[in-house]
A protein has these predicted regions:
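Ribonuclease/tRNase effector modules and their secretory precursors
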Residues: 1-124
Length: 124
């Protein structure tokens, strides 16, 4: 039973995520956020290993909050920049807000001069 509900959640969330494609974000000067395969894969995999089913389930359930976080006022923004030999500058932006009595945070990533793309989501 749990396996079937996980499979349905995975399929439904994948369809929802693919429909997001690109969204302008007022918290990063109206730049586009790209919703590509790497971001969705990161919901399921970390450090080249599958996340636990519980962690995947939790992250998949949070995907519905992405548009609200990107477009709402009252969102907290944190930025971190690191240097990489492979990509040059990597910028991570965390946007978080309170939804349904929990803090939901999305991570955006920008490699070098590329576009921002969705990287992860979590709750506290």
């Amino acid at each position: 039973m749990l396996r079937n509900s996980y499979k349905k959640l995975l399929e439904d969330t994948r369809k929802y995520y693919k429909n997001l494609k690109k969204i302008r974000c007022k918290h990063i000067e109206n730049d586009l956020i790209i919703f590509g395969d790497s971001g969705f894969s990161h919901l399921l995999i970390k450090d080249r290993k599958l996340r636990s089913i519980d962690e995947q389930f939790r992250k998949l359930c949070l995907v519905q909050y992405i548009p609200q976080i990107i477009n709402n006022d009252g969102i907290k923004k944190e930025t971190r920049i690191i240097q990489s030999k492979e990509y040059g500058q990597i910028e991570y932006i965390a946007l978080s807000g309170n939804f349904d009595n929990k803090i939901v945070k999305i991570i955006l990533r920008k490699l070098g001069n590329g576009n921002y793309h969705f990287w992860s989501i979590m709750d506290k």
